[in-house]
Amino acid sequence: MHSFAAPDADPTMNLPLTPAVAPEVLTPASAASLPLAWQTLEAVPDPEIPVVSIRELGILRDVRVVTNDRGETAFEIVITPTYSGCPAMQQIAEDIAAAMTRAGLGPWHVKTVLAPAWTTDWISPEAREKLRSYGIAPPTGAHAVSADAPRKITFYGRPKDGVPCPHCGSADTEVVSAFGSTACKAHYRCRTCSEPFDYFKPY
């Protein structure tokens, strides 16, 4: 098993399991293999909402080739949690490990970056449609800021115009609980079709 020490690595910002790769790796990290690494990781699903990928949710921020002081190259996989302390991050790191190993890519390491903080603005339009089809109302509104711009941290508030029901489209909905199946969702009920649903909180 071969490990890779990233240049200027900050151990507090890297998930613990990662600088490792299976011995059967055939494709080293290079500019030529970078597109394959992206393609591999774009298919990794979110463990809590498997209908969307970590790229579509904006969790996967970057994949790049880095070189250490010994001249060795590796893939650096940059991820940002949806919120600090998100319990799914360890599972995401393990799923990334499995995907890279299956694809025969490496060595690699996962780097967790907390700034800029993740925002629901990073969820792609395709992911929003997939969430709706899955029965989860996507976040409404937008912060209208770039990923690198300073952003105020805001807490969840109820949308003024109601959350459209992902089942029937009605905006005549009500909050059942500010806490849904996961910490990033609220639980709603539609008054029109009477169906319950989760709403992905905007922040």
Regions found by a protein language model. Give the residues of each.
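Domain-level signature for proteins that mediate thiol-based redox and metal-cofactor handling
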Residues: 1-203
